Amino acid sequence: MHHSSAPSDNKQHHDAGIQPPRAQAQPPVPPRAQSRPLDPPRSFHGDSFADPFQWLRCADDPAVIDLVEKENAWADHVTAPLHALSDTLVSEFKAHTVETDVTVPIRIGQYWYFDRTAEGSQYVSHQRVPVTLVNDESPAHVDAAPLAPPTIHADRPAPGEETVIDENAQAAGEEFFSVGEWAPSPDGTRVAWLKDTSGDERYTLVVTDIASGRTVDEKVTNVGYGVAWSADSASVLYTRVDDAWRACQVWLHVVGEDPAHDRRLLDEPDERFEVYFEQARDPNWVVITSASTSTSEVWLWPTLQPHHMPVSVTGRRPGVLVSAEPAGDHLLLIHTADSREGSLAIAPLPQVRDEGGAAESVDYSTWHTLIEADSQGPRLLDVEAYESMCVISMRRDGQTWLDYMTRTAPTTPEAAAASARQHRPDYAQIWSEPRAVLPGAHDNGAVLTMNTVGQLDWHDRLILVECQSITQPPRTVAVDPRDGSAHVLREKAVPGWDAEQRAGYVEERVWVTARDGHTRIPVTLVHRRDAACDGRAAGWLYGYGSYEISNDPEFSVLRLPAIQRGVVFALAHIRGGGEMGRWWYEDGRREVKTHTFTDFIDVGRFLVDAGWVAPHRLIAEGRSAGGLLMGAVTNMAPDLFRVILAGVPFVDALTSILDPSLPLTVGEWEEWGNPIEDREIYTVMKSYSPYENVADGVEYPAIMASTSINDTRVLFGEPLKWVQRLRQATAGNTTAAGRASELGSAAVTTTFAGQSDPTERPIIMRTQMVAGHRGPSGRYGHWASRAEEFAFALSQVGINE
């Protein structure tokens, strides 16, 4: 703790130029929390644990907040020598960014919508221009789409341009600001959007008049994700969350009326399930889904008949995941009933009934399979339906793929009505055979992430695809499904990273054999073209590995400074993620969750053993569930990593999953298992939960944990407990000063108060006091936060400028 000298009231001393005596300044020390063993101990399956730091989970305890503030002060002290490097990194982020920019417009109804950013502004402004009918092939009415989006210039407004939501104006006076989702009304006069000013992701529903910018409704609070309109532009659909932050209900709010009169459309009582919805591209429907990790059910709600209840179109079958997309006169479904990697099926539309809601008896014999994946892939993920085509998202060989099919029979209202009446509509000749959207995208081992850009208009005729990688800035490509031709609409400009400069780097896919001798782990590796595998370079290994989320290679200007300094960057596509398909995910969760951690360690050892990275110069990073990964590998292989960046880390996993009252816990039991009822799951989680496996007397890597006080997903008490346990375990250790010679000025072995928490391998925690799971809002706040983390990591591997 710093002790500053007290100001003097003695004027005579000042007049005489004599300074009052100063108290001896004491060097700051790492904060240490009092150990308060839990009484009675936590006891399950014959195992007891008197947790000494469980009290740190109490966010209402002033002593806990005081400790958080002291942790921030200690982080300030440790990172103070790194300010110059942090400032340099921010300058480089800025230099690589075109700050005044626009996005490719997306059509919704009668307008093209796009975002603007401006130099000096923290947030985006959502804009629009009216649709201009310039395509001679289109009939002269508003539903006819031009062949391609218009060109919008960053330096001047477009004719007829107007502001939909200016986030900078809305954020004025707020320490934190985030727009969760937004949707314009069908008549184009209003926009409904979700506002968060604390970071806890409990939103307020706002409705704004676009022409005047006036807020016309801001009465509905405690809202979850999702916003959609009725066809008459009078009512808005939203979700409500319960005390455990589970979106469990869908409600309909009439704009301008008292929320007490809102109508509940759907209630999900099963705590394992969470509801969400989206406006279908077919404007007649909103698609509502209730899903757990392994099971889901889909309803359709008719926007033209807002007084009707949603109707179930899939039923609920345990272990079967399903998604549904209205395709005009029928449904397209992705489901796992026949293959865990998914099947694409076609089915009749439902008949809308006033009572709706209840899970009807679905006749699965009317589902006709169009595409079925085998047990090892490809993994079918999603289908997007339009008036004349559909696009299928999938994974194959560890990478993203897109296929499309075109309609061979037109969509008509008569056909839609017939589909709803028939049990077995004639599915023959409705769709063409699937074709690749960009057939050569992955030729010669190219690493590329392809995704559709979120087109929302039923009448769109082009497929817009965004292609990117770690070294390739996002490129938006328009594909004409009539002949498969493609042309580039826009490539994101990145100053200081043009094609010639990118040519100096290699981005490749390598395969690492796991310790079991047969599992092949895909890794995306980026390095200088002239890099030598001589065991001297610094390395940066990033991982996630949970929830079947794929950690795909995507571009970020924030990575460029490290790569340009010669750091070898690697993405480990480990089990528990979805990179290789559903089976890859299943082989890294519940009873076999440790595969996630051993895969990451095996990739790290490959980087060192192959000479890509020097021993003691490997950075590891992960966030959220990837933070659990960081905590686990820190315990399992502390000698492998020089420094750990753990963002909002889920490091007290067993404690959280044992408490059903906490946000998300019950729904997480399908992901991790239920340790309350299952002894084996308890034992497995006990074996890897990071906080409970910190060992005394171990030389751990330098660690920076980052969190936010209002994070709902991973409570800040988790990293707080973890950091305190690490300090407790390492107190009194001695660290070899000789390591300083390996890293030059990066290592300083000064110790404070007799502890081994030296600047050489500090353990620090940075807490954002007004933010949520994603950290500070606004791009400059985000840059500053990440620059501090990156400077901490780079300095630990000998990169100080």
Annotate the PLM regions:
Residues 132, 209-213, 254-258, 302-306, ...:
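Short loop/turn segments that connect beta-strands within beta-propeller blades
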Residues 268-356, 360-368, 373-375, 383, ...:
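Long hydrophobic segments that form regular secondary structure
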Residues 120-130, 200-206, 244-252, 294-300, ...:
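Structural motif
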Residues 158-181, 192-240, 244-251, 261-267:
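Asp-box/WD-like beta-propeller blade repeats and closely related beta-sheet repeat scaffolds
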Residues 62-183, 194, 273-302, 307-327, ...:
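Non-catalytic accessory segments flanking enzyme active sites
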Residues 112, 188-192, 236-237, 286, ...:
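Hydrophobic beta-strand positions that form the internal "hydrophobic ladder"
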Residues 164-185, 194-200, 211-216, 481-485, ...:
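Cap/lid segment of the alpha/beta-hydrolase catalytic domain
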Residues 572-801:
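Active-site-proximal cap/loop segments of hydrolase catalytic domains
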